[in-house]
Amino acid sequence: MRGIRRIVIAGAGTMGSSMAQTFAKNGYDVTLYDVFPTALEKAKILIELNQKTEIAEGIVTDAQAKEMLERIEYTTDVEEFRKADFVVEAIVEKLEIKHSFWEKVSNLVEDDVVLATNTSGLSITKIAEKVNHPERFGGMHWINPPHIIRLIEVIKGEKTSEEAAQVIYNLALEVEKKPVIVNDALGFALNRIQLAILRECLHIVENGIATPEAVDDIMKYGLGLRYACLGPFEVCDLGGLDVFNNIASYLFEDLSDAKKPFGMLADRIEKEQFGVKNGAGFYDYSDGKDAEKIEYRDRMFTKLAKCLYE
């Protein structure tokens, strides 16, 4: 596999733009591609705002931010993929759209260029069906917001070579991330864990055990603090496997096993209350509270990352 100097990212949304600044911050030349010029303009604004936050938090200097911004190019020209040493795609989460994209792009790049998708749960093996030389294709699942969260899931499809997976893994290390290698499965590992937690949280609220506010506080002031430092298997070892086995023996059968989204989540989807993105979800985000929540999230995530990992 070739050395990596220029990285081309497809999709200039929240994930793609944040990935672009992460690569550029770590010295890579980046081309951010999107079919919509307006998406590229929004990406520029978002990246600049993220840099202002990092300057304010003392993560980068003005000079470093300026240098990073100069490493990013923006384009709607698909021919730019011919210049890529590595490609990562972060376009809409629909299999047919990803198929159309990769069928074209995988035939534009050189045969030794490793290709990755940022899908959060679609099958790597199925996406690879339209990839020229699928052995060089794998998953590179970044976690929102990508410029702050350290974890990256490296997902191996049925045809992903060990060499390609290692290239993706090593690249994640180069940009100061914590990669983990997982095999292809619906939702991979992170989203299976995340959605299992969400299902039980919904079940708790629906059954009157606790309010949404109480559940959020339990995570923020209890489990969240614990899991920021220790994984669930480490927690079990420290607490005693006999203790956890005893609790599991009577509690597992009472936990939710719902097979479809239900109750308060389904109700909000029906009302088109999608969360911060349109002003209402489980909480209200009108009158500027949407921007406040995003700013709070990024500021607190940044502080936590500095405390935990530096």
Language-model region placement:
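NAD(P)+-binding Rossmann beta1-loop-alpha1 motif at the extreme N-terminus of oxidoreductases
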Residues: M1-N50, E57
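NAD(P)-dependent Rossmann-like dehydrogenase/reductase catalytic/cofactor-binding core
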Residues: R2, N26, E174-D184, E206-N207, ...
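Structural motif
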Residues: A10, Y33, T75, A90, ...
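Rossmann-like NAD(P)-binding element
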Residues: T38, K42, A56-V114, G121-L122
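A non-catalytic, amphipathic alpha-helix used as a structural packing/dimerization or gating element
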Residues: T38-L49, I97, E163-E174, A214-D217, ...
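Rossmann-fold dinucleotide-binding core
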Residues: T117-D184, F188-R192
